[in-house]
């Protein structure tokens, strides 16, 4: 049979006692429902298996909906997500739940002027009091004045410390499993923010800087740590089996790029051998034809070295609302996958960075030695014009 045909569509009535697995396997037959089925199958059968390091990027207002707690935290506790790159806004709104604050389901057709007069905030069809922001801000500022925050650090360490305080707030309120930050802290899952100033957390960090706070969030640490995680994903815990790297992308935006740029950072900038992520899975509503990164497809990422060209068959993009897809794929995966041992990548960061630095400096020394040897063996050049090179030392073709 032609490879164009996957399986025959054989519709049957949906029974009244159907499970989520049967619903997806047998009734998500075409269009984006079929893409969502393919994502569920790829996650369950290949991605969330031993030997694969799974990075999640998170954009859009996901945590205000409760999905940080209901859909993502269970995946973290099951060892199915190893590191996260999120907008700061998602982590800020996650704190509302850790602090026991109330958000309400409403509808989008409300009078926003009246909401402003009543000191209420709207995120599409979610409504909450302005005091939720003020009390969360007060919590953040109180926490960030503590001694552990008075130094330079990356956002993984910053969010780990913040998660520790969020967990303490949960305990004080007699709550559990009410915060993605607290869950990541407990499970040793590092959380990065690609643009830490672009959120209310970053705004409060900036305010404290005016008071003389010594806290500085260093993006260079984040770039190198995430690159190290992606690079050492090749080291599998399974004997005689090479590890793999997966990118699970919810939405798009800056977190998507920060997750994918780990690969160019390795081969383009650091000059180390790398082939790209092995798996690429995205839930998005962004179109590819406008040129934005949010809608860029996996095959385009191949041209940048972000995705392994041999792994294109293991890439899926589903064009739908993430609040529809995320609960479905979480339910499917938790049903079909056994929990994995926690990698606790947060604790392994220093060792990975030390080894990445050693390999980078070794590669630099080798390139410089080869360049020197080549120069000694070459006849005296007629021109002394400098040759333009990439940071890793590779000459740029056609450039002087």
UniProtKB/Swiss-Prot annotation:
Alphabetical list of NCBIfam families matching this protein: PRK00770.1 (NF001980)
MF terms in GO: deoxyhypusine synthase activity
GO CC, alphabetical: cytoplasm
A Pfam family reported for this protein in Swiss-Prot or TrEMBL: DS
Entry-linked InterPro entries: Deoxyhypusine_synthase, Deoxyhypusine_synthase-like, Deoxyhypusine_synthase_sf, DHS-like_NAD/FAD-binding_dom
Protein name: Deoxyhypusine synthase-like protein
Tree of life domain: Bacteria
PANTHER family: DEOXYHYPUSINE SYNTHASE, DEOXYHYPUSINE SYNTHASE-LIKE PROTEIN
Region listing for Disordered, in residue ranges: 372-400
Family note: Belongs to the deoxyhypusine synthase family.
Alphabetical UniProt keywords: Transferase
E.C. code: 2.5.-.-
Organism (species): Cyanothece sp. (strain PCC 7425 / ATCC 29141)
